[in-house]
Regions:
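A general structural signal for stabilizing positions within well-ordered secondary structure
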Residues: 22-23, 97, 142
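Glycine-rich phosphate/adenylate-binding loop and adjacent beta-alpha elements
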Residues: 4-42
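Glycine-rich cofactor phosphate-binding loops and adjacent beta1-alpha1 units
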Residues: 74, 117, 121-189
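Flexible loop residues that form catalytic
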Residues: 37, 111, 156
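Mid-domain Rossmann-like dinucleotide-binding core that forms the NAD(H)/NADP(H) cofactor-binding site
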Residues: 43, 49-132, 137, 152
Length: 189
């Protein structure tokens, strides 16, 4: 939304608002900066109808579709074992969606203990990545095998290392964890 008008553009992929346009953060904030808003945004056809459903529209515009798309890309289905890298809003939405899909086991890894507590209270297994324990060992302690059927990265380029490397920004860390956590013949998203 912009301050003067309620707007949306279904033609713009969310990737356009990533690091390629600079450090514009706050897509889930009350206000955000949209580069090139003069052509990136279109008015809602019916502003009053949009405002009545704004909470539903906000959820469907970013967090849940991103979470669900990652699960679909990874081939999550009934009975799958799933590793979710990241317990932020998108990772938590993915954990809830994986449960609705019927995943047999949902494991969420993160450094933030409060976020991990949230997903644990919702029935997921958790992995505290600040511990100096290899991810495969932590997965094996939960499942009895060191790998999952499907894994998805909901961290991206803000990833950090595991354990004693947790203070270091390592953009490749989350995707490397996802790849290492997935069994041969499994899939990632």
């Amino acid at each position: 939304m912009c301050i003067r008008d309620r707007t949306v553009n279904p033609q713009v992929h969310c990737g356009a608002y990533g690091f390629n346009l600079g450090d514009f953060q706050g897509g889930q904030a009350e206000y955000l900066f949209v580069p090139y808003a003069d052509f990136n945004l279109l008015k809602f056809p019916d502003n009053d109808a949009a405002m009545e459903k704004i909470r539903d529209l906000a959820l469907l515009s970013d967090v849940l579709p991103t979470a669900f798309h990652g699960l679909m890309e990874a081939g999550v289905k009934v009975g799958s074992t799933v590793y979710i890298a990241g317990a932020g809003p998108v990772g938590r939405a993915a954990a809830a969606a994986a449960r609705l899909i019927g995943a047999a086991a949902i494991i969420v890894g993160d450094y933030d203990k409060e976020r991990l507590d949230l997903v644990k209270r919702n029935g997921c297994e958790t992995i505290d990545l600040s511990q100096d324990i290899p991810l495969a060992d932590q997965i094996e302690a939960i499942l009895g095998v060191p790998e999952v059927d499907c894994a998805v990265d909901y961290v991206g380029s803000e990833a950090h290392g595991i354990g004693h490397e947790a203070h270091e920004l390592q953009p490749q860390a989350a995707i490397n964890q996802v790849l290492a956590a997935t069994r041969a013949g499994g899939a990632t998203g």
